[in-house]
C-alpha cells in the first residue's frame, strides 16, 4: 500500500549521484510508512472473518504466482549457467555481478530493464510474466560473457 516515484534531472553526474544516494535513505522514511487510511483498511479486514478469508485467498494466488515466476527464473538461470542468489520467495531475483552498470546498460538496449546494485543485478519477478522470467536469465548470462 505504498507508492512513490522520483525522477532526477541533473546537470552533472555528481549531482545525480548525490540525489540518488540521498533519496535511497530519505525516501524510505517517507514512503515506507503506512498511511492512516491503509492502516484503517487493514484493521477492517482483520475485524471481518469472511473478508479476511477472501483477502487470504487473493494473497495466496499472488504469492503462488510470484513463487512460480521466481522458480522459472531460478530454473532458467541454472540452465544458462547464471549464478544467482537462491530464490526463496519475494518480488526480486538477485544476481552477483562485478560490473552491474555495464551489464544493465547492455540489457537496456534489448529492452530488458534490471536494477544495477553495488555488487549485482536485481530483476523484478513481480513485474514480468513467468515466460519472461524463464527467458531473461539466458539474456543476462549472454550479456555477462
Model-derived segments and their meaning:
Residues 1-145:
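PLP-dependent class I/II
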Amino acid at each position: 500500500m505504498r507508492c512513490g516515484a522520483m525522477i532526477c534531472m541533473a546537470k552533472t553526474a555528481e549531482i545525480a549521484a548525490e540525489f540518488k544516494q540521498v533519496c535511497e535513505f530519505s525516501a524510505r522514511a517517507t514512503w515506507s510508512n503506512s498511511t492512516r487510511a491503509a492502516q484503517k483498511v487493514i484493521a477492517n479486514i482483520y475485524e471481518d472473518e469472511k473478508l479476511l478469508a477472501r483477502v487470504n485467498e487473493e494473497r495466496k494466488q499472488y504469492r503462488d504466482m510470484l513463487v512460480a515466476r521466481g522458480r522459472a527464473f531460478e530454473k532458467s538461470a541454472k540452465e544458462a549457467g547464471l549464478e544467482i542468489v537462491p530464490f526463496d520467495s519475494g518480488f526480486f531475483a538477485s544476481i552477483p555481478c562485478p560490473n552491474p552498470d555495464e551489464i544493465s546498460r547492455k540489457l537496456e538496449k534489448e529492452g530488458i530493464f534490471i536494477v544495477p546494485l553495488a555488487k549485482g543485478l536485481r530483476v523484478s519477478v513481480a513485474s514480468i510474466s513467468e515466460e519472461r522470467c524463464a527467458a531473461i536469465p539466458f539474456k543476462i548470462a549472454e550479456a555477462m560473457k
